[in-house]
Amino acid sequence: MLVGYARVSTEEQSLNRQIDMLVDYGVDKRNIYQEKISGMKPNREQLDKMIDELQEGDTVIITDLTRISRSTKDLLNIIDRIKAKGASIKSIKDTWLDTSSDNPYNSFLLTVMSGLSQLERDLISQRTKEGLKSAKARGRNGGRPSKRNDKADTVGLLYREGYKIVDIVKQTGLSRATVYRVLNDLKLK
């Protein structure tokens, strides 16, 4: 029996494209396990349920490698669990991922390709960390600029001139809590 597995990383993303591909490949829609969770999460309920319910001779169909795993170690572990049930796994896009035969080239390619996939993620992560470190060295912090920084001088000036908090809130458009935080930061309150 063909069994499908479809996964997206967030609730906002749609599984429709993957489900359509799996159905077109010949997987019965009732046999598609669907998940909206990061591939990096170790506990994926639907993946575990699918593997538990596999029967000898079943074939798990995925649209591509990244749908079932984001790390080499995890991928190889999942494949071992599927094989232990007497089942196999095939990828529609990554055609080299096919454990239904004992082809040594498929095993070799699986190991190499999953390793390259892990290398790519590690390089992206490294570049991101380097970029954040570089930005921090230039005095930039991540995220949206704070509203307090834009109007802190105005809040301090108005407070020193004797304006009440209510009036400062009206003039600056900041919340009371933000005005108090700014005054605290400026050591005026």
UniProtKB/Swiss-Prot annotation:
Domain Resolvase/invertase-type recombinase catalytic, first and last residues per copy: 1-139
CDD domains, per the entry: SR_ResInv
TM region positions: none
Example GO BP: DNA integration
Alphabetized GO MF terms: DNA binding; DNA strand exchange activity
Ranges annotated as DNA-binding: 165-184
Active site, UniProt feature: 9
Keywords: DNA integration, DNA recombination, DNA-binding, Plasmid
Entry-linked SMART domains: Resolvase
Region (Disordered): 130-151
Family label: Belongs to the site-specific recombinase resolvase family.
Role, per record: A likely role for the res protein would be to stabilize pIP404 by reducing the number of plasmid multimers resulting from homologous recombination.
Protein name as annotated: Resolvase
